[in-house]
Structures are given as C-alpha cells and as structure tokens.
Amino acid sequence: MIEPLTHTALDGTAHGFFTRQGGVSTDLYESLNVGLGSDDAHSRVLENRDRVRQYLSATALVTAYQTHSTVTAFVDTPKEAIKADALVTKTRGLAIGALAADCAPVLLADAENGIIGAAHSGWRGAF
C-alpha cells in the first residue's frame, strides 16, 4: 500500500512525497521505483507509476528526464523524456512529479490560479 508523506500547506491539492514503500520492484529498485530511466523492468516501473497516478486520482503522471539544470518545462499534456528539472502545469487531472535520491524534491501550488509545480532541486540547479 502506498502511504506518501503529505503536508497541510498543500491541503486541497492532491500531492505526496512518495517513499519506496508500496511498489512492485525488487532487488536494487525495491519497491516503488517510478524512474523511467532506470534499469528496472519497464513493466514494474509502469505499474509503480500507475499506483502513484491512482493515489493522486490523476489521468496521467509526468516526470522529467532530470539533468541537474535550471530548466523548467510547462506541461499541458502527458509527455515523456522532457529534459528539465522542474515541471509546471495548470491542467486538471495531470499529475507531475520530481524524482529524488540525494537531492530535494520541491512541490509548489497556487490554489488561486490552479497551477502546480514539482522541482528536482540538486546542487547545480538550486544554486
């Protein structure tokens, strides 16, 4: 079962800081690996991504091909392999995410304007 960390500052916005629990990946990638660029079995990654998507009640989940940059991409439809370290959308039902290991994931929400953001804040892009 997926049980992400959430924060009251984002109440009213479907969100979560997902841990490794609740997925189907094994061995090195155990368990909730959602990284399309990993060497994990593609079918497992897709199942994990679908579990996150369902948790968020989203129609699609978009993550970037993170490059440790300051590049931000605006996403209005499901896409893959966008080279960026931050994603922004105002499309209802579209979940966006930032993957992190030793970097910081940052979630942003502007409820008044219906805009959300997800950023991968690494040493190069944060400074």
List the predicted regions and their residue ranges:
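Conserved nucleotide-ligand handling architecture
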Residues: M1-F17, Q21-G22, D27, Y55, ...
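A residue-level signal for beta-strand positions that form part of recognition/binding surfaces
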Residues: G12-H15, S31, L61, A95
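Short glycine- and Lys/Arg-enriched binding-loop motifs that mark or flank ligand-binding interfaces
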Residues: T19, S31, A118
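Gly/Ser/Thr-rich helix-start
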Residues: G23-V24, L36, A118, W123
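Short, glycine/acidic-enriched capping/hinge loops at junctions between secondary-structure elements
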Residues: D27-L32, F74-D76
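Short, His- and charge-rich active-site/binding loops that engage polyanionic ligands
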Residues: E30-S43
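Phosphate-centric recognition/catalysis
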Residues: H42-R124
